[in-house]
Swiss-Prot record:
Influenza RNA polymerase is composed of three subunits: PB1, PB2 and PA. Interacts (via N-terminus) with PB1 (via C-terminus). Interacts with nucleoprotein NP (via N-terminus). Interacts (via N-terminus) with host MAVS (via N-terminus); this interaction inhibits host innate immune response. Plays an essential role in transcription initiation and cap-stealing mechanism, in which cellular capped pre-mRNAs are used to generate primers for viral transcription. Recognizes and binds the 7-methylguanosine-containing cap of the target pre-RNA which is subsequently cleaved after 10-13 nucleotides by the viral protein PA. Plays a role in the initiation of the viral genome replication and modulates the activity of the ribonucleoprotein (RNP) complex. This is Polymerase basic protein 2. A motif (Nuclear localization signal) lies at residues 736-739. Belongs to the influenza viruses PB2 family. One of its GO terms (molecular function) is RNA-directed RNA polymerase activity. Signal peptide: none annotated. Its main location: virion. GO terms for biological process: 7-methylguanosine mRNA capping; cap snatching; DNA-templated transcription; symbiont-mediated suppression of host cytoplasmic pattern recognition receptor signaling pathway via inhibition of MAVS activity; symbiont-mediated suppression of host gene expression; symbiont-mediated suppression of host mRNA transcription via inhibition of RNA polymerase II activity; viral RNA genome replication. InterPro entries: Flu_PB2_2nd, Flu_PB2_6th, Flu_PB2_C, Flu_PB2_CAP-bd, Flu_PB2_middle, Flu_PB2_N, INV_PB2, PB2_helical. Pfam families: Flu_PB2_1st (PF20947), Flu_PB2_2nd (PF20948), Flu_PB2_3rd (PF20949), Flu_PB2_4th (PF20950), Flu_PB2_5th (PF00604), Flu_PB2_6th (PF20951), Flu_PB2_7th (PF20952). It comes from Influenza A virus (strain A/Tokyo/3/1967 H2N2). It comes from the Viruses. The gene is PB2.
């Protein structure tokens, strides 16, 4: 009070007031505070103070020729005083208004192109729908999210090269545009931005927004795709959320979503093949997502998901060092352990060999719908603090943590035998056996776990074995929290190794990922996924296998035909025929194969019995290991559309229908392509026309290498000799003529010579 009286007393003297309001501030400390450094210390005050002046803006001198001194209302637009310290003019804010209304017009054609991301955002918001606001406690957890919708996925360096090439093409400096996406974008942008008058720096900045993924570590309670993150401030607060449906999708979110689906399908399929790693790589390299090679997307896309990371590991790319168990991402935050093999007995007295982690460790567990902090010692859960969207999600997290703890009471809670298998019919490892068992039914596990009295801690609550919340009791060591656990924020990537069975390990040998961790969730991809690999034909069911197998034969007919006549065994072993075997009834596969192979051998032996349509139709059946039997078949059965359907050995059927006049093949009513029938099938002498310009020398001569197809003959040099496969699957030796003049006579002599060469 004394101080206030004193101040009042001072202020009552007129001199004090004058000193405080009129004199300059000359205290060194204050001057220093507000003048040192380039950073503005009080921007809003500075702005208000500047705008209160008459001429707060400076402009280039040319403005005086382009803007009148006064506007229609007679207000002065610029001052004759020049700006202190530069050769610019002092200008009133009214000049800006005048310029906006009456200044020169420039072409606006480039604006939507350069500011594309903004225009698209406006469209998304215009068409988006905002629903009701709900007031409730928000469990937000920090996740690394994409904050920039509509971008490509170039690395910063790749983008920099593209931007330099587009915006400053004549600048010196080495720029190497290597990836397909770099070249496409550069070409596209150069065309779009021809004669663009927008400042190059602005164009460069906007291009960066379009090319590079920008991520931030933000607290999120709902959707994490970039079209939700761009409205995060509108959709979730501390105690409220607003429902929102985006008014459009962006390619980067679609790529992320489709990549996950493709990776899951590929890992699931590879896991059941004879050589999972080789199959996985073959599929990754032959798959396209939305027209872009999957391997290119994997190299650029930072999405962290189990299947995606397995694919990346197979390609030798670095991945996050966290590991996955039961669909949760575990990150060790402190402690350490050594691993030791130990044999344990289940409640059913079954022996399990488990790798025990000895030592005290703390982990964060992050799943799609629940998160937790886990503290554990050797085979003992010390504490689990879990939070989740709903009861079911919390249960999932608790089961995973209990199994991961390797506690004895968990192993003793097993009722019945553990014999879960993976898709390839191999037994799962013991930890996954236990996990599957309790995911089916955790009642005994929770009952046997034990309960304890709990202290009242803010934001924490106990949970009983039947999942009812309680403030007095809880399952031992387990608490439910209102607060979520943040995702691991580091973007650090580590070198990993992958074995033949797709188990991914870090350099210490810890398993980070395995196919068991890949989610079984099925989704519909947003972008078209094109699996060129025959291994993925079965993804759309038996019909797709049938159509794809025959399409493959037709597309590769030229080479198939040569192999058919010269190296049939190699042809029968082609992996493209593998999926087809699942359509042929198991009991009769071998007999069919033996029958078809014998039939084909007769065709090779007996002149004039070569029949393109029949070879194509029956070829897939010859791929199974043959059984020798005297059985003859007039039709072969395939299992499609839920029942056995017949393919006739001679003639058409609904499954395989070839129209001789239109040359089109339909499989189950679906078009499978055009068949180029071989010459001399029923039309004698046509093959000679194909051999114009060649002289037939006689029977096949192995010294001149494998038989060429008729298409490959054109590559021969004049006078060069080669074996060639003609009409009926027969091989003859030919020489390319040295003179073109004699071509006319070829047609007549060829027919005679072929007959002689063959007989």
């Amino acid at each position: 009070m004394e101080r206030i009286k004193e101040l009042r007393n001072l202020m009552s003297q007129s001199r004090t007031r004058e000193i405080l309001t009129k004199t300059t501030v000359d205290h060194m400390a204050i001057i220093k505070k507000y003048t040192s450094g380039r950073q503005e210390k009080n921007p809003s005050l500075r702005m208000k103070w500047m705008m209160a002046m008459k001429y707060p803006i400076t402009a280039d001198k040319r403005i005086t020729e382009m803007v009148p001194e006064r506007n229609e209302q007679g207000q002065t637009l610029w001052s004759k005083m020049s700006d202190a310290g530069s050769d610019r003019v002092m200008v009133s804010p009214l000049a800006v208004t005048w310029w906006n209304r009456n200044g020169p017009m420039t072409s606006t054609v480039h604006y939507p192109k350069v500011y594309n991301t903004y225009f698209e955002k406006v469209e998304r918001l215009k068409h988006g729908t905002f629903g009701p606001v709900h007031f409730r406690n928000q469990v937000k957890i920090r996740r690394r999210v994409d904050i920039n919708p509509g971008h490509a996925d170039l690395s910063a360096k790749e983008a920099q090269d593209v931007i330099m090439e587009v915006v400053f093409p004549n600048e010196v400096g080495a720029r190497i545009l290597t990836s397909e996406s770099q070249l496409t974008i550069t070409k596209e942008k150069k065309e779009e931005l021809q004669d663009c008058k927008i400042s190059p720096l602005m164009v460069a900045y906007m291009l960066e927004r379009e090319l590079v993924r920008k991520t931030r570590f933000l607290p999120v309670a709902g959707g994490t795709s970039s079209v939700y993150i761009e409205v995060l401030h509108l959709t979730q607060g501390t105690c409220w959320e607003q429902m929102y449906t985006p008014g459009g999708e962006v390619r980067n979110d679609d790529v992320d979503q489709s990549l996950i689906i493709a990776a899951r399908n590929i890992v699931r399929r590879a896991a059941v093949s004879a050589d999972p790693l080789a199959s996985l790589l073959e599929m990754c390299h032959s798959t396209q997502i939305g027209g872009t090679k999957m391997v290119d997307i994997l190299r650029q896309n930072p999405t962290e998901e189990q299947a995606v990371d397995i694919c990346k590991a197979a390609m030798g790319l670095r991945i996050s060092s966290s590991f996955s168990f039961g669909g949760f991402t575990f990150k060790r935050t402190s402690g350490s352990s050594i691993k030791r093999e130990e044999e344990v007995l289940t409640g059913n007295l079954q022996t399990l060999k488990i790798r025990v982690h000895e030592g005290y460790e703390e982990f964060t567990m992050v799943g799609k719908r629940a998160t937790a902090i886990l503290r554990k010692a050797t085979r003992r859960l010390v504490q689990l603090i879990v939070s989740g969207r709903d009861e079911q999600s919390i249960v999932e997290a608790i089961i995973v943590a209990m199994v991961f703890s390797q506690e004895d009471c968990m192993i003793k809670a097993v009722r019945g035998d553990l014999n879960f298998v993976n898709r390839a019919n191999q037994r799962l490892n013991p930890m996954h056996q236990l996990l599957r068992h309790f995911q089916k039914d955790a009642k005994v596990l929770f009952q046997n776990w034990g309960i304890e009295h709990i202290d009242n801690v803010m934001g924490m609550i106990g949970v009983l074995p039947d999942m009812t919340p309680s403030t007095e009791m809880s399952m031992r060591g387990i608490r439910v929290s209102k607060m979520g656990v943040d995702e691991y924020s580091s973007t650090e990537r580590v070198v990993v190794s992958i074995d033949r069975f797709l188990r991914v390990r870090d350099q210490r040998g810890n398993v980070l990922l395995s196919p068991e961790e890949v989610s079984e969730t099925q989704g519909t991809e947003k972008l078209t996924i094109t699996y060129s690999s025959s291994m993925m034909w079965e993804i759309n069911g038996p019909e797709s296998v049938l159509v794809n197998t025959y399409q493959w034969i037709i597309r590769n007919w030229e080479t198939v035909k040569i192999q058919w006549s010269q190296n049939p065994t190699m042809l029968y072993n082609k992996m493209e025929f593998e999926p087809f075997q699942s359509l042929v009834p198991k009991a009769i596969r071998g007999q069919y194969s033996g029958f078809v192979r014998t039939l084909f051998q007769q065709m090779r032996d007996v002149l004039g019995t070569f029949d393109t349509t029949q070879i194509i139709k029956l070829l897939p059946f010859a791929a199974a290991p043959p059984k020798q039997s005297r059985m003859q078949f007039s039709s072969l059965t395939v299992n499609v559309r839920g029942s056995g359907m017949r393919i006739l050995v001679r003639g058409n059927s609904p499954v395989f229908n070839y129209n001789k006049t239109t040359k089109r093949l339909t499989i189950l009513g679906k078009d499978a392509g055009t068949l180029i029938e071989d010459p001399d099938e029923g039309t004698s002498g046509v093959e000679s026309a194909v051999l114009r310009g060649f002289l037939i020398l006689g029977k096949e001569d192995r010294r001149y290498g494998p038989a060429l197809s008729i298409n490959e003959l054109s590559n021969l040099a004049k006078g060069e000799k080669a074996n060639v496969l003609i009409g009926q699957g027969d091989v003859v030796l030919v020489m390319k003529r040295k003179r073109d003049s004699s071509i006319l006579t070829d047609s007549q002599t060829a027919t005679k010579r072929i007959r002689m060469a063959i007989n």
